[in-house]
Amino acid sequence: METSKRNISFGRSIYINLGEQVVTQVLEEMKAVRQTVAFTSFQLPEHPLEISDMARLVELARSYEVDLIPDIAHKDLTKENIAALKKAGLSYLRLDEFGDEAFIERCGKAFTLVVNASTFTHREYKLLERLGFSRQIIACHNYYPKVYSGISLEKFTTINQKLHALGVKVLAFIPGDEPLRGPLHEGLPTVETHRTLDTRLAICAHPVGTQC
């Protein structure tokens, strides 16, 4: 899938609270198999982050030729922080919620926007279209830590069909393998029926893989 910089097919998730040694190991593994994009979250209640922490992780990932797609709290996306993350080399930004038009325009000029596939509305799409960002956006589903909280395959397919009709590329999550992220350690899938599947089987079972 072509974006502004990368061809995304498969990626990984990395989390700064796992420690730099674990993060570096994952990045080394990604570089070895030419994976170029990783999801991360900068919204970690158990591990509050400063903008300098976020920028350092972006720079570390870039040193392994990996671009991050970070989930960042709206309050942390000040003009100064956007500039700092852009300077560190950040290319993508996941927006869980839309702010006002000026905020969206500021973010869209700095980064390729990654919207929440589950909540993205046609009105939001038209706003991005008017601002000139609709051709470069990506939609990313949520992952669901709790057993039975993931969405059904039917809902997943319906959402994807609507997004594909708009020309929007879609990303989603498979459960992952060891070490599973805490505190529940139940995997982080988008589709509930994928939760107990082996990683390779989950990849093969994922309809997104044949449509993006």
Give the predicted meaning of each segment.
Residues 6-16, 37-40, 66-73, 91-95, ...:
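Hydrophobic faces of well-ordered beta-strands that scaffold small-molecule active sites
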Residues 36-56:
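Glycine-rich, proline-tolerant flexible connector loops at the mouths of alpha/beta enzymes
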